[in-house]
């Protein structure tokens, strides 16, 4: 899909269509990074260091899905680099306009679309898995300081008489 979308982007001249394509491509890169990050987390050893990760098995990486090439597992280091590269592309394509205004365009907190701050949040998580603490703090701080998102408090009332925590446990009917 990403290969086809890039080909369409090169042939499109209408700015409105280009914006839509950029959003779709950015979301696809983000979704692929998210999927690969979950695969790495579930099926690979923990990332200890760059030297160690270069010798550990990662996941099968593919940027295109055509042909009958032999699929081999990449190193853990290459797997994480693939995820970070996808996040770089996604951040570039999903960058918010400088004049984005939550008063007129709505909040990002309940948005159904990915944006540059969801990319920063995932990057912070991936960097935590890679034990790159300072970089993880940098990207998490970008999300927190953006003012577009807020943390929920377990003492904040979900109803007039219960905290989220109490509400969750007393009203779970599954």
Regions found by a protein language model. Give the residues of each.
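Structured, solvent-exposed acidic/aromatic patches
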Residues: 1-30, 37-174
């Amino acid at each position: 899909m990403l290969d086809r979308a890039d080909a369409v982007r090169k042939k499109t001249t209408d700015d409105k269509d280009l914006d839509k394509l950029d959003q779709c491509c950015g979301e696809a890169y983000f979704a692929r990074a998210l999927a690969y990050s979950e695969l790495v987390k579930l099926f690979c050893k923990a990332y200890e260091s760059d030297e160690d990760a270069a010798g550990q098995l990662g996941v099968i990486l593919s940027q295109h899905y055509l042909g009958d090439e032999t699929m081999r597992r990449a190193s853990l280091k290459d797997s994480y680099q693939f995820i970070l590269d996808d996040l770089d592309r996604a951040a570039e394509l999903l960058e918010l306009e400088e004049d984005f205004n939550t008063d007129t365009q709505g909040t990002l907190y309940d948005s159904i679309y990915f944006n540059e701050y969801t990319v920063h949040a995932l990057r912070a998580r991936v960097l935590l898995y890679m034990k790159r603490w300072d970089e993880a703090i940098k990207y998490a701080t970008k999300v927190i300081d953006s003012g577009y998102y807020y943390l929920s408090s377990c003492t904040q009332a979900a109803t007039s008489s219960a905290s989220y925590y109490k509400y969750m446990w007393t009203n779970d009917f599954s």
